[in-house]
């Protein structure tokens, strides 16, 4: 089994094969990907769809001297297998194993780290120009999906690439007619037999946005209007960018891919190759339902993914989806917005029930936030469902277009904290710090499912921008209450009181997901625990009260310490004039790799045992007692 694949330890081995051996190799590679992912979990549909393209690229181009940048990067398992990591695939996305995305530190063939979408063309162009300036003769290749091509950054790069006439840069559009969620809007119309409608329309919109402000391109603007009316063949659009357009060709036909790439290899200047592929290619279950098989856990390939027979705890994403439907039922002003994450953000049911109030704007986080701001000015109640890591992409819009105008937009921030197998690129570690400094913002962190529901309801009542953050995955098992209860603004609650004598009284100020492990630590130490609820405005009165009645304060959050929720408590403490030693616990100043979330939190000292250990070492050992007594005497 895998007789050919076992002979490939790097692309040089691949290039020694006869052309007639490549299709059998592709069959083995596809089977190996399916077998590997079924054992570890990971991205499947996209990787089954890029097998032939990956083989062709490494066969024709002299990698790693020629650079390949994979947009998003979740489709790179065939690439990893062919570049020396075949025998490490059992560790894919596991702790201390190989990443599910390209990483420069992992292999010289991973020329640029990716995981967020639409960055590849910019990176490849930068590499091409850098190689030019260094006197190196190499190709830089960006492989980008049709969903990622809808983002503005891709068109900004295309516009820039077009003026670099001698740069050896190749953009490959992997047109598989699907991003994670089905593409939307005008981008879904077909203009030609195999030409992706959403890509063409997005290209038109992107060119207009990038170029319309420049007086010299009025003629181009007129040509764009002609494109829209179907008066000019679609390929001309790419030529207006300065690219030589080739395609579309079958992305699963090596006899088409290889000669085409060999011809392109001899050309100079920006090239654009349009290939058509199918997600899930070669595995009928994934072909039939590429969304279900986009990122499965472990499963039996012979049987496919089976529904779980054991009742699962409700996920926070499900809590959000149910809440949004309930609010929309009560109030016709409620609208839901997602940047291409309908399934991931729990909005499938909302779309079915409230289609006229559901807006999937595509991979366009910047637009999503400003779009919501515009809706708010018209009296609507927009709710933006977005992952913490993707909100980073719309930071200017959050400040300039929403907060500065104090518009009542609700941000439902999913995947806050560590996310596990997707690793550092998707960690929601920074949202508290980057939002807390923005005037007019209200920020809440949910400790359980019902609190998440009530916080979301509270957010919808606010006259200003408000964010509720919650983690990936299942909650604590707390049932949600159907009736809504508005939480008093900026007020936390004490969950547990210490019975320790003066000198040993510890108060733990916990935020969101850290309430449960803090309670576990408090049982061991007999400490007070406060569920702070609000990061902004932080409950300054509660901070002062706890400081006045305790000897030591500890803040705990599942986010970066610098500038985070703990910092808000320290600032409130300084304002109160009550001086107490404070220990701030949170995620370390590191990019935390992929792994099991519970194990990663334990390694960060953010489980019950770790929190108790940190408190003991800082405050409750003999040296701390002596220091505390000396401070009190002074």
Swiss-Prot record:
Cofactor comment: Binds 1 Mg(2+) ion per subunit.
EC number: 2.2.1.7
Domain of life: Bacteria
Listed GO CC annotations: cytosol
UniProt pathway: Metabolic intermediate biosynthesis; 1-deoxy-D-xylulose 5-phosphate biosynthesis; 1-deoxy-D-xylulose 5-phosphate from D-glyceraldehyde 3-phosphate and pyruvate: step 1/1
Catalytic activity: D-glyceraldehyde 3-phosphate + pyruvate + H(+) = 1-deoxy-D-xylulose 5-phosphate + CO2
GO biological process: 1-deoxy-D-xylulose 5-phosphate biosynthetic process; isopentenyl diphosphate biosynthetic process, methylerythritol 4-phosphate pathway; terpenoid biosynthetic process; thiamine biosynthetic process
Required cofactor(s): Mg(2+); thiamine diphosphate
Transmembrane spans: none
Sorted UniProt keywords: Isoprene biosynthesis, Magnesium, Metal-binding, Thiamine biosynthesis, Thiamine pyrophosphate, Transferase
Annotated Mg(2+) binding sites: 146, 176
The keyword Magnesium belongs to this UniProt entry's keyword annotation: yes
GO MF term list: 1-deoxy-D-xylulose-5-phosphate synthase activity; magnesium ion binding; thiamine pyrophosphate binding
Record-linked SMART domains: Transket_pyr
Keyword tRNA-binding: no
Residues given in the record as thiamine diphosphate binding sites: 74, 115-117, 147-148, 176, 283, 365
Similarity annotation: Belongs to the transketolase family. DXPS subfamily.
Subunit details: Homodimer.
UniProt function note: Catalyzes the acyloin condensation reaction between C atoms 2 and 3 of pyruvate and glyceraldehyde 3-phosphate to yield 1-deoxy-D-xylulose-5-phosphate (DXP).
Protein name stated in the entry: 1-deoxy-D-xylulose-5-phosphate synthase
Gene that this sequence comes from: dxs
